[in-house]
């Protein structure tokens, strides 16, 4: 590889770097535009975040450029190293001496310096492009900042309106769907409860009729009692004791059946029938005195059986008490069922109240939607558009005023030049006045120029007044815009409050659903309890049959007691027993009457207690309903208050619109008045000018000069005021400083390019020196060959003749000295002179290494 190829590689590297820089700058510009578009909304609010992201993008771009530069530098280094290796290979064919390592190190250093300089150039070029882009942005922003900010605010407002409209629409659609679903669920639950209630009522009525049907009728019991009495009379008339026992057993079984199925009144009637039978037995006692002895033995047996019968009666009384307890439990279950039914009815009434509340809620929502539509119609969009148009007009007027001010500045500069000329002319006039007194024409000319200056000063003053007035109007309009946006934010907060109220209503509806589910569960529990009641009734029937069987087993004892009573012939004992029995019967009848009265009293008290509990539950339900109605009324009043507030706000918005219109009319009137004032001021100014002309014609040149100085002072004050109004001069100075910095960086860049050119020239010189070194090396080889030849000749000459040893000795010494000098010169070139030359060419500062930024070299 030749040096031309090496330099072509370097040129390709520089071209590639320039192209890659152009591409990277293009991509960087695209990234910057994308970032600006992405952060368009937050350009004013979060400018720091935008600048940070831009800095990160620039850093990534610079790093990628460095990596590409390192890759290309490595390729160039490999090409140069191949070139050097080829050179040394070509030289190694002529000599076996290895090349010194110092040459390669020097080339390494040279290449590293070249690559560093190119990397610095690329970085400087990137920084220059970045600074130019920032400078361009700042110039655009400084030329028209109000338009950029206004455009950004308009886009942000449009995006916010679109987002708000989309969210509002989605929320309303979702709320509508939720309300429709909830209403459908309520209707289904109400249909289920309405279809279930008549079924439950019919089932309960059927159960009551079955119970009534199972109970024995009073007529049947009376008929059975008459038949038993008639059979007993026939048996007594017959007097057959053998057949009497069987018939008595049958009658006793029938009596037991009747007693088991009859109530306490039937038992009293049966006891009275037994008393009548005992009285009838008194007539039979006279006929049974003969059988008294036999009956005594039987009497003892009867006493034992009587004891057994009393024990069985106690057992039957315990069973009856258990049955009464079970009946009480059944009555309690029925009371619980009635209470649950009542709660179900209350829940249905609450559901009706909830439906009424939902209807009122829908009505309120319709009113709110109407108000929202009215508010969206009155959404201050028109006012905002009007205000924005007015602000834009004001900004245009301000821009025109700024342009006028710049024009006035130019005019002022011109006037300053004219004033300088006037001063110069004044000096000339003074010289002429010294020579001869001035004429009236010069005085008229000066007065005319003075009048023009006064008019220009008045125009400047009026324009500054207009500028201040427009700035105040702009500030007032901006405050109005902020107030309107604040009112709109308040409306949004009220809407959020209404949404929270809707969520509360939804939670109440969920509570109603939960109550409905609980009532359904309680209905299931009632059904289970009804099944338990039926099971208890079945157990009662079974126990009733068992009692009948037990009473059938006790009929033998009763028959023996009757036989004992019939056969007892002892009148005294029988009378005593009969009297005692009658007394016991009367006491029992009285106790039964008292028990019946107590039972009636207990039933009445229980009924009163039940009615009281029902009334208490009804009162509690009514209280709950009253509380719910109060809460609903409070919510309704709050809603109505909110609606009234919204209506008031709508009226206030209408008033604000009307006020805006009135203000616009007032503005037009004020503008007309300002125009009239301008006309009056113009006329007054004309009159003042005429008066000043009349006065100045009578003045001397010195007074004109003094007035001119005063006007100059006024011009200087106006300049100071103009500089205070605008700060563009500071921006201009800052931009000029940036331009100076950029120009300095460009100068540095040009210096670096000059250094690169100088390095290329130094590389060429180094190549020339390497060529000279090759020539010297060839001469050195030739001298070595000559030395070898002379040595050979001396060796042959020594063998031929030894006549002149001193001659040969001096010649050989001369040749050795020449060879030593050549060796020293070549060694000095290879070891000292060439590295010094390379270091001098590279001009590497002390402390630097041959490694690059990436650490590859």
Curated annotation (Swiss-Prot):
Structural component of the ventral disk involved in maintanance of a domed conformation of the disk required for proper attachment. May have a role in immobilizing the microtubules between cell divisions. GO terms for cellular component: cytoplasm; median body; microtubule; ventral disc lateral crest; ventral disc microtubule array; ventral disc overlap zone. It comes from Giardia intestinalis (strain ATCC 50803 / WB clone C6) (Giardia lamblia). GO terms for biological process: microtubule cytoskeleton organization. Shows an alpha-helical coiled coil structure (30 repeating heptads). Its main location: cytoplasm. This is Median body protein. Keywords: Coiled coil, Cytoplasm, Cytoskeleton, Microtubule. One of its GO terms (molecular function) is structural constituent of cytoskeleton. The keyword DNA-binding does not apply. Disruption phenotype: Morpholino knockdown has defects in ventral disk formation and an abnormal ventral disk structure in a nondomed or flattened horseshoe-shaped conformation. The lateral crest of the morpholino knockdown is discontinous and mispositioned. Glass substrate attached morpholino knockdown trophozoites have a significantly decreased ability to withstand normal and shear forces, and they have aberrant plasma membrane contacts with the surface, including those of the bare area. Residues 169-546, 571-793 form a coiled coil. It is found in: Cytoplasm, Cytoskeleton.
